[in-house]
Structures are given as C-alpha cells and as structure tokens.
C-alpha cells in the first residue's frame, strides 16, 4: 500500500496513466478466444481540434469500450482520422495565401505533396487531444482515410459500383459552391433566412397581345429563362398555354407551359422557369421536354455571367459578378418598362417587395450556393437504400432512441441520387479516364483502363476527387482489412457491436455506412446505432463561434480534470435530449472525485487495503452484509443501464451508491467497529476485508466513467496482479442479496436521519449529546437498538437508549 497524499493533481495522474496504458498495450490486451467486441470512432477531420461534441461522443464510446474490456471481451476501438477533402484543402490554401502564394501556382502533384507535408506536421492535434480525454483507442492500428490500404478499398468500391450500374455519370443540377469551386452535397448546404426582395416582372407575349407577370427573388437568372409555367387548371392562363413570350434583354422566345408546379394562389400564378439554375425549375423543364444538355447556363464556376449556348446574353453583362449583374438587369428592366412597381401599405411605390428569403450557403465557404448544371458522378442511392431500410425494419440494426427511426425511413425512402464527385485536388482521385469523345473508362488502374479502351486510344484522367463521405462510408469494414481480408466477418469484428453518433450526421455518414456495408459485406455495419443530441450553452442556445458561447473541453479538463468532464457527459446524456453545459455540475463531479479520494484515504488510515479476492468476503455483521448486497445490486443496475445505453441512469446509479451509500453511510457506520468501540477483533478484521472489497468493486464499476482517478487509487491501495483497466467486472450474484441486513440498516439510516432532523428543528448544538428514550418498542426494534448502539451514539450523538419515555413523548 502506498500512502495517498491529501490532495490529488488530475493533470499529473492523467498524463502518467495514459502513457502507461498506451506503452503497455493495454487498450488491446491479448485475449485469445475471448468474445470480440468492436466499435469504430466517427473519424474526426485531420484538420480538427477537440470540441465539446467530440468530448461527448468519445466519452460515451469509451465508457462502453472500458466496460466491455472489464467484462473480459476482446474489446477493440477502431480509431483514425478523415482526410476531410474540402476542409483540409482550405487549410493548406490559407497557409499558402499567408505566404504570398496560391494553389494554382503549383502543379496538382506539388500541391498534394504540400498537403501531406501539412498532415505530417499538424495533423495529429485531434488525436493528441483524444488521449487527454482518456480515450482507450487502438492506436497501434490507427487508420487514415487516405492511407494505402484504405485507398485500395475506395477504388474497389467505386469500380464495382460502376460495373454494377450503381455509379454513373450524368448532367444534373448540383449545389455549386463558387467560393470553393466545387459541387457540395445537400447536407453541406446551410439554409439561412436573409433580407431580400421580390421583383415583379412583365414578360410581353410574342404576338403582341399583352403581358404575363412573374415574380422572382433572382432577376439575373432571366438571362437563362426557358419557359413560363402556369397551372393547367388556372382559368386566367388556360388560353395562353402553348403560346410564347419574348424575354426582355435577351429577346429570347420561350413557351408558356402548363405545370402543377405553378400555384394559382401564389403571386400572379405564373412562374419563370430557369431549368439550368433552379432545382424545381429543372424538374419542370424535364416535364416540358427540355433535355439536360439543352438547358441554358448563364454562370461560370465563379458565379460570374457567361454566354449562354444560344448566344443571346448581351456582351456588356458577360463577366459581371452575379450580384452586380442583378443591379444592372433590374435597372435596365425598369428603364425599358418591364419592372412592375410594388406598392406598400401607405401607397408608396418601390422597385421591389421586401421579403425574408430562404437562401442556401456553403457551410464551409459561407458563399451563396448556386444550382449549377454540370456533369458529375452519381451513386444510385435509391437502390442501395432499400436493404438499409429493411435492415432497420427487421431489427438487424436497432436505432436508439427509437424515435429516430421515422426520420431515417423518411430520408431513405425519398433519397436522391448522390453526387460523389468534387472539383478538388485533395482526396481520392476518381478512377476514370476519358477518350477524346468523352467516353469514360472506369478501372482501378490506368493500365486496366487503357486495356479496355484499346491500344493507341489517348486517355485523360478525370481531375475530380470523391466526396469525403463516400470513403468514410466504408469505415466499419475498410478499417478492418477489407478487401485484402476476405473473411466475411473480418475476424469476428464485423458487424460492429454499436455505433455512437451525433444525430447531425445520421444522413452524412450513418445511413451511407448502412448502404455500403450491406452492399459489400452482405451484413449490417453495426448492430445498434445510438444517436445522441447536441451539447448546448447553459441557456439552451446552440453553441457557435459567432455567438461567443462555445466551451473548450480542454479548458474544462485543465480546470476540473478529465474524469469530471467525462462523468458530466455521461450523467447529462439522456436519450433523445440535448445537453445543457453547466459548469456548476462539472464542479460537483470534481467534488465527487475528491470525495472518492478522501474515502480511499480514510480506508488507508484504518488499515483497509486492496481485496484479496474477487468474491465478497464472508460477513456476519449486518452493516457488512448490507454493503455487499448494495454493491451487487449496483453492479446489476449498472449492467442493465449500460446494456440499454442509458448513460445518465448508469452514472446516477454509481454516483448515488458511492456518495450516499458507501461514503456517507457505510464508512460512518463502520467507524465504531474499526476503532474498537466494544467490538471483537474478528469483527474489525471482517469489516476491513469487506470495506476493501467494496472499494475495489467501486473502482472497477466507476472506471469506465472516471478512468484516471480509479486507476490511481487501484494502484495505491495495495499490490495488484494487473492494472485496473484489465481487471474483472464484478459478478451480479443474486445470492449475495440479504433482505434482513437491508431491512436493519435501512431502518438504522431512517432512524439516524429522523434524529438529525429533530436536532436541526430544535436547534440543538452539533456537539451536544441527547438522551434517547424508547416506548412500546417491538422485540425486533429493541434487538436492533442494542446491536446498533455504537452507530446510533456516533451518528445521532445520542446516549444509550432508555426503555422509558417522558410523558407526552413519542415512541
């Protein structure tokens, strides 16, 4: 036994023990023949730093991993980072800009080399921070989504999907980010409410018989208008369907079409249709018989005005930024009499009607997104989604909380083709080559593509890379050695046991892992999907840098210790709810760690050391039989809570047991025994053995939540055969439950509590002793009073019980 200091330093303990665990390989102990248990971390961006959401996500995972390891399973937590195509390229480009250069000053190969250099120098920040949190990850097998083995898996998946007709090239509208110069997914678009305008325009009928009025928030897109739509049952316009209008500025003739997209109750009931720059208009255009290749495009990759295929855009507009062009076009429409003024409530006329507009922004660039018509690679997500839907319906994968199933089904049943090509330099290069006619040849190597194209056919490599989420969708099996490892269960590691994920990446990542895992492995990627909420500011607002209300988890670790932060996350994680950040609670859980530390110091001071047995000692004293039963009941409750992923219930269960039952009551109740107040030496020895055993079980049970302090106390309480991280989880043996001891000690606790309440009510000084009178006591109560005399005297500060009660007194 090593004497514990009066206070403990979390920082010193944390760094020392984490280094020990990792150096000794204790995150992956050799357990030949043990039941495999596997979880994968959502790979953080290699550019990232630990935020409070990471702290929650990884704490919950580590609790499950450590619990599984303590239960004797061959627990493996697969760890790695994501190459984060857009984010990483942005970081490196900013670094180049700061040095006075830009990406296009380099060849593609030279720029990619720069990114690899950056990763080698700066890419390990997030993994160092995960270590500070105490994450017991399999660092010896750390993966990266651009490492050689993983890249082979990505290429194989793309090529196989292409050969199966599930990857194809198509000209469709995409979310184009002009700031980044690439397509982005719907999930990377952030819609914001901004102050904008409705402009009302008058389009003249080609036959000169009148006008049709339309309204738009984007008048500049009229340069690529290809139709005006009206509802086919709208009596005002039925006679106009099939006629043409002559567009102002371009003088283009476009048809009036009947389409139910037009709402007779909204505005004039007539809608301008720009199929090359609006997702709804694209569908209207297709229904009107306009092929994608015929749809007009009026913007270049930087969202500046360009010439349309029909050459009708005036030269003076070409090259203008889209928003500058808007001003010029509105002014010209007004000058030529095609702008209909809007009249406000006071009767004043204005060029436009003020409106709040739902506007799409790129979540990384902050630029307004343009629907842009371009050739891209797509995955047939609807086909891949069908088995993924059925897997959840059948229970092959269970979603917790179950309420998220409806959201999952709704998105998967209405899923759109997945655009997987990105116009970047950093990422998995698409394995496709084109001949002079633009025909693609998809293969894992250029040699295979050339063989398919034929000798002498000149091929050019597709410059695009794959969406980062395409590669990370393979994470549950590509990290385990697929495709080189052809074992369908990947050594018993697939399917993973559970996935812990924020609900915000349910569609980005979780659903796509379901699709790819089922397609290539013929089995679900994880048996359970647990979706947690957000960590919000104390007032319930969403955290954001712009609001200045973010919380740095590393700052919280510095202030309160990693154990306190971890326990806070577990205690506050209630299924289906967000967490409100509360520093007072963090402080409270630091105090909880201090209370445990002081309890261990008390044990040392009273000759209580590490237990010599996993099994509970034999006990005769009621108080010892009681704490053994309470310990076993806590084990059973913890196992149930963790099996149900009720992290808050698990944390509360162990907290109440340690603070209240063990520290506040048991240690106080055994003081008379330990200090020899009229008890036999055998009883004191029994009590030391039971107390040491109970403290050991506490350290084991609490270890998944607070690994650092528990490991430190485990090592200091006496010699051990092994570290706590690989100890054995207590057995919930129902035979240890003892109703008679529970009744007696619960009676004692109630009696002491009543005495203390009476003392407080009567303002009795804390040090004053009171006489204890008893009336009409049963034989059982009388026996208990005698047996618990020392405990009553110490805890209630009362004298020996007298069998008479004063007149008017209570029994």
Curated annotation (Swiss-Prot):
ATP binds at residue 545. Signal peptide: none annotated. Its EC number is 6.1.1.9. Pfam families: Anticodon_1, tRNA-synt_1. It is found in: Cytoplasm. GO terms for molecular function: aminoacyl-tRNA deacylase activity; ATP binding; valine-tRNA ligase activity. GO terms for cellular component: cytosol. It catalyses: tRNA(Val) + L-valine + ATP = L-valyl-tRNA(Val) + AMP + diphosphate. A motif ('KMSKS' region) lies at residues 542-546. InterPro entries: aa-tRNA-synth_I_CS, aa-tRNA-synth_Ia, Anticodon_Ia_Val, M/V/L/I-tRNA-synth_anticd-bd, Rossmann-like_a/b/a_fold, tRNAsynth_Ia_anticodon-bd, Val/Leu/Ile-tRNA-synth_edit, Valyl-tRNA_ligase. Keywords: Aminoacyl-tRNA synthetase, ATP-binding, Cytoplasm, Ligase, Nucleotide-binding, Protein biosynthesis. A motif ('HIGH' region) lies at residues 44-54. It comes from the Bacteria. NCBIfam families: PRK05729.1, valS. Belongs to the class-I aminoacyl-tRNA synthetase family. ValS type 1 subfamily. Catalyzes the attachment of valine to tRNA(Val). As ValRS can inadvertently accommodate and process structurally similar amino acids such as threonine, to avoid such errors, it has a 'posttransfer' editing activity that hydrolyzes mischarged Thr-tRNA(Val) in a tRNA-dependent manner. PANTHER family: VALINE--TRNA LIGASE, CHLOROPLASTIC_MITOCHONDRIAL 2 (PTHR11946:SF93), VALYL-TRNA SYNTHETASES (PTHR11946). ValRS has two distinct active sites: one for aminoacylation and one for editing. The misactivated threonine is translocated from the active site to the editing site. Monomer. This is Valine--tRNA ligase. It comes from Sphingomonas elodea. The lineage of its organism: Bacteria, Pseudomonadati, Pseudomonadota, Alphaproteobacteria, Sphingomonadales. The gene is valS.
């Amino acid at each position: 036994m090593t004497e514990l200091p009066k206070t403990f330093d979390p920082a010193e303990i944390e760094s020392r023990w984490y280094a020990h665990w990792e150096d000794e390989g204790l995150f992956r102990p050799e357990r030949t023949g043990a039941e495999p248990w596997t979880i994968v971390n959502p790979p953080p961006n290699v550019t990232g730093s630990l935020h409070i959401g990471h702290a929650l996500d990884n704490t919950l995972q580590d609790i499950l991993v450590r619990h599984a390891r303590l239960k004797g399973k061959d627990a493996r937590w697969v760890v790695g980072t994501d190459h984060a195509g857009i984010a990483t390229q942005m970081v490196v480009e900013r670094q180049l800009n700061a040095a006075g250069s830009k990406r296009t000053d380099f060849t593609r190969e030279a720029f990619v080399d720069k990114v690899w250099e950056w990763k080698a120098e700066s890419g390990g920040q997030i993994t160092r921070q995960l270590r500070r949190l105490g994450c017991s990850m399999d660092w010896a097998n750390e993966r990266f989504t651009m490492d050689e083995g993983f890249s082979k898996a990505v290429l194989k998946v793309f090529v196989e999907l292409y050969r199966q007709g599930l990857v194809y090239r198509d000209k469709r509208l995409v979310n184009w980010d002009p700031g980044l110069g690439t397509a982005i997914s719907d999930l990377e678009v952030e819609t914001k409410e901004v102050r904008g305008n409705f402009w009302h325009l008058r389009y003249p009928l080609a036959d000169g018989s009148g006008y049709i009025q339309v309204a738009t928030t984007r008048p500049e897109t009229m340069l690529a208008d290809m139709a005006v739509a009206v509802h086919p049952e709208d009596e005002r316009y039925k006679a106009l369907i099939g006629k043409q209008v002559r567009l102002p500025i371009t003088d283009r003739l476009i048809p009036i079409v009947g389409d139910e997209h037009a709402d007779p109750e909204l505005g004039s009931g007539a809608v301008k249709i720009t199929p090359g720059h609006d997702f709804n208009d694209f569908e209207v255009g297709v229904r009107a018989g306009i092929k994608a290749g015929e749809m007009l495009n009026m913007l270049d990759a930087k969202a500046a005005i360009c010439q349309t295929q029909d050459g009708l855009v005036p030269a003076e507009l070409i090259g203008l930024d889209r928003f500058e062009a808007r001003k010029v076009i509105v002014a010209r429409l007004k000058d030529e009499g095609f702008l209909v003024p809007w009249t406000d409530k006071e009767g004043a006329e204005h060029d436009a009607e003020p409106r709040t507009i739902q506007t799409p922004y790129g979540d990384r660039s902050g630029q307004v997104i343009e629907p842009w018509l371009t050739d891209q690679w797509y995955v047939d997500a609807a086909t891949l989604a069908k088995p993924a839907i059925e897997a959840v319906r059948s229970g092959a994968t269970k979603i917790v909380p179950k309420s998220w199933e409806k959201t999952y089904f709704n998105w998967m049943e209405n899923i759109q083709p997945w655009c997987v090509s990105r116009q970047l330099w950093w990422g998995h290069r698409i394995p496709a080559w084109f001949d002079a006619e633009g025909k693609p040849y998809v293969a894992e190597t250029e040699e295979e593509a050339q063989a398919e194209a034929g000798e002498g056919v000149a091929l050019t490599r597709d410059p695009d890379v794959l969406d980062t989420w395409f590669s990370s969708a393979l994470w549950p099996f590509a990290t385990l050695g697929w495709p080189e490892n052809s074992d369908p269960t990947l050594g018993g590691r697939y399917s993973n046991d559970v996935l812990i994920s924020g609900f915000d990446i349910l569609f980005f990542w979780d659903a796509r892992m379901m699709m790819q895992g089922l397609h290539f492995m013929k089995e679900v990627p994880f048996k359970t999907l647990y979706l947690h909420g957000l960590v919000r500011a104390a007032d319930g607002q969403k955290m954001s840098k712009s609001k200045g209300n973010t919380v740095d988890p590393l700052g919280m670790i510095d202030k309160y210790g990693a154990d306190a932060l971890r326990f806070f996350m577990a205690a506050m994680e209630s299924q289906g709810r967000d967490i409100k950040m509360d520093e007072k609670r963090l402080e409270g859980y630091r105090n909880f760690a201090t209370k445990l530390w002081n309890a261990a110091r008390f044990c040392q001071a009273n000759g209580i050391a590490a237990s010599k047995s996993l099994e509970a000692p034999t006990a005769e004293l009621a108080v010892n039989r009681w704490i053994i039963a309470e310990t076993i009941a806590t084990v059973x409750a913890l196992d149930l809570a963790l099996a149900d992923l009720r992290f808050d219930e698990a944390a509360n269960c162990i907290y109440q047991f340690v603070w209240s039952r063990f520290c506040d009551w048991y240690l106080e109740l055994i003081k008379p025994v330990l200090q020899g107040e009229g008890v036999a030496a055998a009883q004191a020895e029994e009590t030391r053995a039971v107390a040491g055993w109970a403290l050991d079980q506490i350290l084991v049970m609490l270890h998944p939540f607070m690994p650092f302090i528990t490991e430190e106390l485990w090592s200091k309480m006496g010699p051990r055969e092994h570290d706590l991280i690989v100890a054995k989880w207590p057995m919930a043996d129902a035979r240890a439950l003892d109703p008679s001891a529970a009744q007696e000690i619960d009676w004692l606790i109630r009696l002491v509590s009543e005495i203390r309440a009476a003392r407080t009510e009567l303002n009795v000084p804390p040090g004053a002793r009171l006489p204890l009178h008893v009336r009409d006591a049963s034989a059982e109560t009388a026996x208990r009073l005698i047996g618990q005399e020392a405990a009553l005297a110490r805890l209630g500060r009362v004298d020996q019980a007298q069998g008479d009660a004063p007149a008017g007194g209570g029994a």
